[in-house]
Amino acid sequence: MEAVVNSDVFLTSNAGLKSSYTNQTLSLVDEDHIHTSDKSLSCSVCNSLSQIVDDDFISAGARNQRTKPKRTGNDQSQQPIKKDCMVSIDEVASTHDWSTRLRNDGNAIAKYLTTNKYDTSNFTIQDMLNIMNKLNIVRTNRNELFQLLSHVKSTLNNASVSVKCTHPLVLIHSRASPRIGDQLKELDKIYSPSNHHILLSTTRFQSMHFTDMSSSQDLSFIYRKPETNYYIHPILMALFGIKLPALENAYVHGDTYSLIQQLYEFRRVKSYNYMLLVNRLTEDNPIVITGVSDLISTEIQRANIHTMIRKAIMNIRMGIFYCNDDDAVDPHLMKIIHTGCSQVMTDEEQILASILSIVGFRPTLVSVARPMNGISYDMKLQAAPYIVVNPMKMITTSDSPISINSKDIYSMAFDGNSGRVVFAPPNIGYGRCSGVTHIDPLGTNVMGSAVHSPVIVNGAMMFYVERRQNKNMFGGECYTGFRSLIDDTPIDVSPEIMLNGIMYRLKSAVCYKLGDQFFDCGSSDIFLKGHYTILFTENGPWMYDPLSVFNPGARNARLMRALKNQYKKLSMDSDDGFYEWLNGDGSVFAASKQQMLMNHVANFDDDLLTMEEAMSMISRHCCILIYAQDYDQYISARHITELF
């Protein structure tokens, strides 16, 4: 383990403006095939499009509207672009007021770098601050540096990289092949503009009035229908059962299909797609989808998956937790190959990484040591979708447990074996593991050095906890009967984290299901039986356990939890006299509640937990932790910056 004390490590870390993104693993477009809505055994994209046609998202009495493309002066734009041409995508978006000035500042910095022929290979945050001083650009909010750096990077990369290895969205914007236009015309017929517009409008309107699942407590929650087999995955519930800053903007307000359409037809995108565009343009690595061999088809399939997840979000917030076979998103997410990770992912990490990669969501920027030749290293800024915590590689004791709190949150390292950012507190020995180079950027005075924090976050911060003891074996417990062993090492999880003067609260957690999670949460069972989610709502912790409808023990535990929650409401949170009430006045309520659960219908209050129960389950069984700012504070902070 190497240790270097440097309070300015974040400011002097390489910002990585020269992107290593390359798409040369795939061809540009399939010259022999146009994707249609006809089902095909040989094309997974056509099958996805056929499901969109069959879906009746929302009915409304609106006429189908045709999008009129912007006319150009000649047809030269439809000709293929030579591979040695340069493509500029600067100024492609009209933005919200709060981001207009940020983008203009980013463009000014990028122009300064280009005009002065600045060497961007060693560009650091300190260099950017120096340029900002020269240009009289004042940014007092530390988190704005994350977004400002993204603006500079996207402008430089896509203005100076040749067409053959640049981003697919740039190729669509530049109309690099006539076949792109032919494919988008066919898509325009498949995505009925009226129905798709209604789906977008409905989910955006729903988002305006949604905070968490307690906002839907006046609805009945339906877990299963007799003709359905699939259910909303707990990871989807953790991400969208509560409104998370930045992710909500990219997934609900942004839309991949309209982004592609606007880039091709108008060469500009509308304000609601701006954050999605910036996320996509600053990707470090492309994704590859099994069975899809070209870039344009990959973008189409990405748009299909985004639409399927949007429908799942709408259903989640309406209390519909089941889905038909054709609507299941999980099989599509499992087919995505993440080229930036060099090891086999577990099922839950695969689903989490795939959901975030659809919109290029990487909310955490960390200064980490990247290995170079020999034993040397280079400090670089690394954007990460989530931070990996591996209890099996950490040496812990009862006096020194793994702690995720405001003090240890600054301890990050880069795992060269997997290409991921890992949580590596120096006091528990993770730095001795092969492939991990650990740098102590703050020395001993962590709390007093927050201004030099090596971590900045855009809205949300996610942790993935590797608890599977045999993770290198292929998963699929639901299909093969294979049972993973789970490491239940307790983790000291703080409900709140203070980072750069901003409070991030624990909003949701996905846990491994080992027992019934009510009577035997302290069970010695170590075999994985599934997953469940705990959301921290305005009314308290709430559990989403879709597998409880299939297990007699879990059904009984759920009924008992619902009855106790009802009694606490009547008795001012007291447990005394519960069984007397159950045999007396509560017998009618118990019978009606049992009938509801037999029909797989529940109310929000039925699955409320105490804070002690929730934190106990999360400590031993969590696999995903999601911290976030309060959404209203996140949005208002951006409007307040306009005043200055």
Swiss-Prot record:
Coiled-coil boundaries: none
Keywords assigned: Virion
Modifications the protein undergoes after translation, according to the UniProt entry: The 73-kDa precursor is cleaved to a mature protein of 60 kDa during virion maturation. Proteolytic cleavage of major core proteins OPG129, OPG136, and OPG098, which occurs at a late stage of core formation, is required for production of infectious mature virions (MV).
Prosegment residue ranges: 1-61
One GO location term (cellular component): virion component
Region listing for Disordered, in residue ranges: 60-81
Pfam family, one: Pox_P4B
Localization of this protein: Virion
Main location group: virion
Record bears the keyword Lipid biosynthesis: no
Function recorded in the entry: Major component of the virion core that undergoes proteolytic processing during the immature virion (IV) to mature virion (MV) transition. Essential for the formation of a structurally normal core.
Protein family membership: Belongs to the orthopoxvirus OPG129 family.
Entry protein name: Major core protein OPG129
Organism: Monkeypox virus
Organism lineage string: Viruses, Varidnaviria, Bamfordvirae, Nucleocytoviricota, Pokkesviricetes
Gene name as annotated: OPG129
